[in-house]
Regions:
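C-terminal transmembrane helical hairpin of 12-TM major facilitator-type secondary transporters
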Residues: 268-315
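Interfacial helix-cap and linker-helix signal at transmembrane-aqueous boundaries
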Residues: 32-33, 64-65, 147-155, 230-231, ...
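Residue-level signature of mid-helix packing/kink "hotspots" within the transmembrane helices
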Residues: 23, 50-59, 141-142, 252-260, ...
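A late C-terminal transmembrane helix in Major Facilitator Superfamily
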Residues: 322, 326-357
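Helix-loop-helix hairpin linking two adjacent transmembrane segments in secondary transporters
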Residues: 133-180
Length: 400
């Protein structure tokens, strides 16, 4: 297999593992709570450190990716994530669990500002490449639901962390052995890419940050809450945790393919024309889901997750289209630090909010957040001014 394909395979696997690790806890939390004599809602705040560092850790990770090298950072990502997973599996007290999850979040923060710029840096179809990479990440979410449910039921919650941890270590070893060293760090390469007016760039980054924050909150609310939400709304119809995990995995798998379609559209049309209807469609679906039960609710979960996952490629597409490769990891790191740092609040509030007000209120809140995202995206310029003549040839390799 050519080295470029091996690199792509390992980077896409890394994205899957990144999301898988962050969501094992959301599926296993009921089993952990039962073992420790607690309720799952009271355990959810213990994972907030993981999501805070998942965001804040993006700043140093992005800086090191540009200035030191992306290959070395990806090796650290795989090996560190695996070690952290084994640490979670060995936790004996809630505080130990919180510390181990926080360490896991720190290593997980490396992937997005480093792995995604690495996989698109030589791509002639960045939208499709981002869509395929996003599909891999969301399949990791699907696998988290079904694999965790299976392992929890058969072998206990600790193995649900240990098995993916060993896979991550294996990927790290393969990455170190197979992927060649970079000739120079990205920050030292010659400049290539579009040059846009400062006012346009400020507007794009303003919208990108706001949309990233609200979109990340929706992503965290859904992916961390869907497992318990499905258990509540399908009670009496499906009560087996493994079957619930399978249903959730099916929904995530189907929804994940939306990113391939969206990626192809991004390569052909202005970002705003594709992004706006996708976020707008989330609003009525969350409103309908708030009062639905049974299989109707499951159909709505499938529908709204198509649009939640379909919205994921846009922020990365903005960075690829408008930011030179020399500083993409740093820009991505800054964006991720803000959006994931703020959206970590969603994880912290999930348990207490559901305990106090129920899932109906949560779904209504998500509808309001999606409406805000729609407003933010509407502020994007319809068409971006053409790049300067000097930048155009180089830009064709990175912009659709």
């Amino acid at each position: 297999m050519p080295k470029a394909r091996v690199l792509s395979l390992l980077l896409n696997t890394g994205h899957a593992l990144d999301h898988l690790f962050l969501l094992i806890f959301a599926t296993a939390v009921s089993a952990i709570a039962a073992e420790w004599g607690m309720v799952w809602q009271d355990l959810m705040p213990y994972t907030v450190g993981a999501f805070v560092l998942f965001g804040l850790g993006s700043l140093p990770a992005g800086r090191l990716g540009d200035l030191w090298g992306r290959r070395a950072m990806m090796v650290i990502f795989f090996l560190g994530l695996g070690a952290a997973g084994l640490l979670v599996a060995s936790a004996q007290r809630p505080w130990q669990l919180a510390v181990a999850l926080t360490i896991m979040g720190a290593f997980a923060s490396i992937y997005h500002p480093v792995g995604i710029p690495m996989i698109v840096q030589n791509s002639t179809r960045p939208g499709f490449t981002i869509g395929l990479n996003g599909l891999a990440g969301n399949l990791g979410i699907a696998v988290a639901a079904v694999l965790t449910g299976f392992l929890v039921q058969r072998t206990g919650w600790r193995m649900a962390f240990a098995v993916p941890a060993l896979l991550a270590v294996l990927c790290g070893v393969l990455f170190a052995l197979v992927v060649p060293r970079e000739e120079m760090a990205p920050a030292r390469k010659p400049r290539r890419g579009v040059e846009l007016p400062a006012s346009v760039m400020m507007r794009i980054f303003f919208v990108m940050t706001l949309a990233a924050v609200s979109g990340s909150m929706i992503f965290n609310f859904t992916t961390n809450g869907n497992s318990q939400l499905l258990a509540e709304r399908l009670r009496g119809l499906v009560d087996d945790p493994a079957r619930l995990g399978l249903l959730l995995a099916l929904a995530y798998t189907v929804a994940s393919f939306a990113q391939i379609v969206v990626g192809k559209l991004i390569d052909r049309y202005p970002l705003k024309a594709v992004y706006l209807p996708i976020v707008a469609a989330q609003v009525p679906l969350f409103l309908l889901a708030s009062s639905a039960q049974g299989w109707v609710f499951y159909a709505l979960v499938l529908a709204f997750m198509v649009f939640v996952f379909g919205a994921i490629p846009f922020i990365d597409a903005m960075i690829v289209r408008y930011v030179d490769d020399r500083m993409r990891s740093r820009v991505a790191g800054m964006r991720l630090a803000v959006s994931f740092g703020v959206s970590a609040l969603a994880v912290y509030l999930l348990g207490p909010t559901v305990k106090a007000a129920g899932f109906t209120t949560l779904l209504l809140v998500m509808a309001a957040i999606s409406a805000a995202t729609t407003l933010f995206v509407s502020l994007l310029p319809g068409r971006v001014p053409a790049p300067s003549a000097a930048a155009a040839p180089a830009a064709s390799a990175t912009a659709s």
